[in-house]
UniProtKB/Swiss-Prot annotation:
Residues spanning the membrane: none
Keywords from the named record: DNA damage, DNA repair, Endonuclease, Hydrolase, Metal-binding, Nuclease, Zinc
CDD domains with a match to the protein in the record: AP2Ec
Enzyme type, top EC level: hydrolase
Protein name: Probable endonuclease 4
Reaction it catalyzes: Endonucleolytic cleavage to 5'-phosphooligonucleotide end-products
Upper taxonomic lineage: Bacteria, Pseudomonadati, Thermodesulfobacteriota, Desulfovibrionia, Desulfovibrionales
Amino acid sequence: MPLFGAHMSAAGGVSNAIRDIVEIGGEVLQLFTANQRQWTPKAPSAADVEAFRRRRAAFGGPVFSHASYLINIANGDGAASAKAVEALVREFERCTALGVDAVVLHPGAHLGAGRGAGILRAARNIDEVFDRCGGQTPALLLENTAGQGTCLGGGLNDLAEIIDASRHASQLGVCLDTAHAFGAGYALHTDEGYRRCMEDIEYGPGLAAVRLFHVNDSLVPCGSRKDRHTHIGEGQLGEAAFVRLLNDPVFAMHPMVLETPKEDGHAADRRNLATLRRLAGR
């Protein structure tokens, strides 16, 4: 069966995210390692890093970081591009200190320069990040998008082309978000739509490249090019889409993280985790 978890807040210290994922019964954690709304956020203190590593050892599950939404790795503007690279380097440094397994990153927007130019710029900027970090670094997982505006990643081949264009392809992978895929036009709630999505993965980045799922239902219709998450089974995707994914033997042991609303805090996460486990036949 897949491993189920959630994105948890690191308010009050990153080690609190580990505490909270254990408290809700999660098996995998995603978090922001610093304030994702700031370009130069404060890094976790040495004491918090130590507490995180101690709790993480007891937790035992995979841990992923989500890079700041401010980072546009496909930006071709010199100053903006350098700022994005610097922010991702700092993210890698924090994740290395914490022992995080991989960083999730949106592939960015080409801002009118064109898809091809954006893909090449994303690959070059990613290469610069790995070149600067050197040695042992977390993996970098490119997340698909709903394809809004000039964002890359609506088509899964965008991710494949970024990976292929990078000198560090062996350190890159894919995070597949169900709500984003649905918004981009993959009808995951139907047999044919699910098959098409899996074929695009297989003949694009490759099934082995998928290392993480964001499991989110969608408030908006298939192909809307919008990104609006809701609780599992309560949106346009519906429970049938998740039954199909959660019971696909190809992804039997994959980590799957909720990014669903938390209007009543941890209670919402517990309900969504229970729904996922029920749909997976646990």
